[in-house]
Amino acid sequence: MRNPKLKNLLAPTLLSLAMFAGATQAAAPLRPPQGYFAPVDKFKTGDKSDGCDAMPAPYTGPLQFRSKYEGSDKARATLNVQSEKAFRDTTKDITTLERGTAKRVMQFMRDGRPEQLECTLNWLTAWAKADALMSKDFNHTGKSMRKWALGSMASSYIRLKFSDSHPLAQHQQEAQLIEAWFSKMADQVVSDWDNLPLEKTNNHSYWAAWSVMATAVATNRRDLFDWAVKEYKVGVNQVDADGFLPNELKRQQRALAYHNYALPPLAMIASFAQINGVDLRQENNGALKRLGDRVLAGVKDPDEFEEKNGKKQDMTDLKEDMKFAWLEPFCTLYTCAPDVIEKKRDMQPFKTFRLGGDLTKVYDPSHEKGNKGS
């Protein structure tokens, strides 16, 4: 530009425009990936629905639960059958709520029966009114249950909130109650898991960040979104040059299983961040891709993990298709190799309550296979 006066006049204007563009993006309402906007498949009527199961009692007690690895050494890799049963028994109402919410939302998005929606909202509203899962009296397993439950519920709820069918339009009072409860619980989850030392930051922190990301979108809270992104960055910066997570390698014979378990929350956070204008794919030189590739290679040849930590790997968990639900968001973030796509197709649909239900319907709807796995 040859005219210096004009250049000086324009400079502040261009700066203002750039600042305005940034502010507009920051102020734009948070949203989930496009698949969450899907309308209800069809609206059925009549008496073919399953009815509403008995509501699990809202859990308002102390979040003090026994760990299924009780008595194990530092590796936390040996299952204690007795304490696992005690854990399952004492947390039964919570997991019933999680599973029931995901199941009913999936059914409603398929069948559109009003009673399916009402059942879900009644459960969530009752737990919200009781201020459930908010106890400040908790141990590590207790605060873990809180963030798992929040992630399950908030990610299922998002499918209702953002659906183009607007199922919550006639249920604004319940929606406000539920969202206020999610919001308060997310604040507690942040408090529970914030700023842990790196040696104690592992898959639990990633799952906590996922629950906060899902809540951020459900309640349009940018502060929660930013915290989830911060925790994501801490997580993927733990991935080494070969795609290993040092803290998960400590899990001895379960190291590969725990590397795989770390992937769903990280892939979901990256996917949700991406749609809101924050590209996390290249963080730590594409660490998420490196981790995913390492796990897929390990599933083919577990000896890679045995060579790394000296322990023969327990492959039991990795025989369950739904443990690979992370492939749905992962293969939209990165270009997956043909053999990975083929593996994904064989295992679809991916339905997992901790990620809000049917991820294939959200990320790869043309390969959804009806009721399989519901």
From Swiss-Prot:
Swiss-Prot/TrEMBL keywords: Lyase, Periplasm, Signal
Job description of the protein: Catalyzes the depolymerization of alginate by cleaving the beta-1,4 glycosidic bond between two adjacent sugar residues via a beta-elimination mechanism. May serve to degrade mislocalized alginate that is trapped in the periplasmic space.
Signal peptide: 1-26
Species this chain originates from: Cobetia marina (Deleya marina)
EC number: 4.2.2.3
Gene Ontology MF term list: poly(beta-D-mannuronate) lyase activity
Biological process annotations from GO: alginic acid catabolic process
A cellular component term, taken from the record's GO annotations: periplasmic space
Keyword Lyase in record: yes
Lineage of the species this protein comes from: Bacteria, Pseudomonadati, Pseudomonadota, Gammaproteobacteria, Oceanospirillales
Residues reported in the UniProt entry to bind substrate: 67-68, 140-141, 258
Family membership noted in the UniProt record: Belongs to the polysaccharide lyase 5 family.
Subcellular location(s) of the protein: Periplasm
Catalysed conversion reaction: Eliminative cleavage of alginate to give oligosaccharides with 4-deoxy-alpha-L-erythro-hex-4-enuronosyl groups at their non-reducing ends and beta-D-mannuronate at their reducing end
This protein's name: Alginate lyase
